[in-house]
Amino acid sequence: DEVQTDLNAGRAHPSVALLPVVGALRERLEVERGGVSLNLPGQEIIAENGTWRTRFRSPLPVERYNAQVSLLTGMAAAELMVGAAVGILRTLPAAAPEAVDRLRLSAEALGVDWPVAQSYPDFVRGLEPGEPAELAVLARCASLFRGAGYQSFDGSLPEDDLGHAALAARYTHVTAPLRRLVDRFASEICVSIGQGEPAPRWAREHLTELPELMAASNRRARAWEHAVVDLAEALVLQTRVGEVFDAVLIDVNPRSGMGTFQIADPAVEAKLPADGREPGRAVRVRLDEVELNEGRTVFSYAA
């Protein structure tokens, strides 16, 4: 927040003064490549006045620009490893045409205009999460980003596609070696390549293990994150049992019929059977129960 404030006021530190220029140029190149980023608000937990609260928050421009620099680093690292035929890339398969067709039908059902000639990336970039129907479409867009994983190689490139469909480029993780295991391996391999030396033996010996290790790690991290958010929501709502809240149904699982809805204030996301309701619809929900020890909240539709 401070960096964005300083940039807006024209007093940014020289080390970040050019970040908006570089970030905007990278965003333009992303558009030209056919890449796409989902502008879904993230849910945050904030300590405030001796208590906790939750909020939905979209990234600041400076955060988007910083992310573009990280992506640029990962793309450059990926090209180094592909050129040396040793390393590990972050991959994402392209969405199946029928999945895009289903998304187009969903947008039509929600009353969100998607011109026939407009590509999927261009359509997604124009969606506004502040509009309930468009937020519902954005939530459904996440289904097109499934299948992300890692592909390792040593000595020759695999026949599988090494691209990342959302970025429309080859990409790897190298910017967070202290919190993400794969970055530790990828960054050391890139340092060796840059120095004209062979990749470290210890890194090469474990390359084939990394994709499954990272898959397991990501599953555990997501479960932990969801549990923390659930507990924070229960803390925020523990004194409000019986209250009715305005909410938006943002998604419905086509198989189970379970709906996901968002309450703006306090920022809560929970589930209820949709019972035939369509995504994008405004609903009123009642908080029936809070189980703090389990981090569980129970809602029902208000009459």
Walk through the language-model features, giving the residues of each:
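Electropositive polyanion-binding surfaces
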Residues: D1-R281, V290-T297
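Short, compositionally biased
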Residues: F299-A303
